[in-house]
């Protein structure tokens, strides 16, 4: 199964350590993570990619992915776009937010009631991974 892991890239990257652990956990479980670059310390634009190249690459990867896992504890226009794009294609989205930041997550994201969307609060990354294990497609909770 192919996972699109989404996380803030240009804004507040306070959850980066959690994103790195999520990436590692997904790969250890045999998932193909298409967006390993979200855990990089150096941004794509700093590596010389243009915004258009980033957009085109990410759209291609969104089309290829089976499920989107998004870290939404900190605001990101890009992550919001990726969630909407995926939802409108009827694909499953799991959004993860630190419990202490849940009220800061966009009301637009917190208000989604579609069947293919889950917003999951977590206290630490181990709890997030445990919840992901039970929610990824193929498990009872996402069907």
From Swiss-Prot:
Pfam families: Nuc_deoxyrib_tr. Disulfide bonds: none annotated. This is Putative 2'-deoxynucleoside 5'-phosphate N-hydrolase 1. Monomer and homodimer. Catalyzes the cleavage of the N-glycosidic bond of deoxyribonucleoside 5'-monophosphates to yield deoxyribose 5-phosphate and a purine or pyrimidine base. It catalyses: a pyrimidine 2'-deoxyribonucleoside 5'-phosphate + H2O = a pyrimidine nucleobase + 2-deoxy-D-ribose 5-phosphate; a purine 2'-deoxyribonucleoside 5'-phosphate + H2O = a purine nucleobase + 2-deoxy-D-ribose 5-phosphate. It comes from Thermofilum pendens (strain DSM 2475 / Hrk 5). SUPFAM superfamilies: N-(deoxy)ribosyltransferase-like (SSF52309). Keywords: Glycosidase, Hydrolase, Nucleotide metabolism. It comes from the Archaea. One of its GO terms (molecular function) is 5-hydroxymethyl-dUMP N-hydrolase activity. Substrate binds at residues 37, 82, 106-108. HAMAP family: Nuc_phosphate_hydrolase.
């Amino acid at each position: 199964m192919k996972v699109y892991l989404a996380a803030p890239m240009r804004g507040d990257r306070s959850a980066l350590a959690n994103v790195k652990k999520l990436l590692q956990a997904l790969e250890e479980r045999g998932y193909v993570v298409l967006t390993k670059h979200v855990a990089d310390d150096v941004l794509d634009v700093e590596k010389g990619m243009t915004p258009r190249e980033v957009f085109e690459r990410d759209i291609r990867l969104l089309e290829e992915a089976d499920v989107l896992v998004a870290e939404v504890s900190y605001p990101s226009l890009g992550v919001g776009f990726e969630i909407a794009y995926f939802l409108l294609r009827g694909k499953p989205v799991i959004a993860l937010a630190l419990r202490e930041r849940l009220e800061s997550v966009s009301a637009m994201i917190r208000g989604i009631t579609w069947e293919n969307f889950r917003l999951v609060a977590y206290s630490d990354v181990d709890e997030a991974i445990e919840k992901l294990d039970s929610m990824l497609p193929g498990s009872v909770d996402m069907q």
